[in-house]
A protein has these predicted regions:
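Glycine-rich phosphate-binding loop used to anchor ATP phosphates in small-molecule kinases
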Residues: 1-26, 59-62, 77
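Conserved nucleotide-binding/hydrolysis micro-motifs of P-loop NTPases
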Residues: 3-5, 28-34, 83-85
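Weak global preference for isoleucine
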Residues: 11, 25, 55, 79, ...
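Short, glycine/charged-enriched secondary-structure capping and boundary segments
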Residues: 11-15, 38-41, 91-93
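Residue-level signal for the start and early helices of compact helical domains
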Residues: 13, 46, 64-67, 101-102
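A glycine- and Lys/Arg-enriched "phosphate-lid" helix/loop adjacent to the NTP-binding pocket
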Residues: 18-65
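NTP-dependent small-molecule kinase module
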Residues: 68-133
Length: 133
């Protein structure tokens, strides 16, 4: 699903209020054009199509909302699916604590550009680890 605006966060917030653990696996792509190509390929093979304006809205809206609301999720996994062969886990968090992260110098441009709060957490963790050495 998509959570490109505040209204779509009502469901995870409701579950959280009721005491459930809320997890998100976020699969990112490098740009909306890559998303368009994947949608076209899916539609060509019998899957559902999505209008280009919705693809763009989903692409940017999802990133904005993740950056703004990542603390809502008890568990968060961010995966780069830009490469069709091998996907890469970029970040794993549990209760806003980093369990795993890709080094900041290896993060894809889309992550750094659209997820500055998560990038800042990685940078802070790297700085902390470097000062402890």
């Amino acid at each position: 699903g998509h959570f490109r605006d505040e209204a779509t966060l009502k469901i995870p917030k409701k579950f959280k209020r009721k005491g459930y653990k809320v997890s998100l696996i976020f699969m990112g792509l490098s740009d909306p054009e890559q998303s368009e190509l994947r949608v076209l390929d899916r539609a060509k093979h019998g899957g559902h199509n999505v209008p280009v304006y919705e693809i763009n809205s989903n692409f940017y809206g999802n990133l904005v909302m993740l950056n703004k609301n990542f603390k809502l999720f008890d568990e968060l996994l961010v995966i780069d699916t830009s490469k069709s062969v091998q996907h890469e886990v970029l970040l794993q968090m549990n209760n806003t604590k980093l369990l795993f992260y890709t080094q900041s110098k290896r993060l894809p441009t889309w992550f750094v550009k659209f997820l500055p709060k998560l990038t800042a957490l990685i940078n802070a963790e790297e700085a902390k680890n470097n000062s402890a050495k």
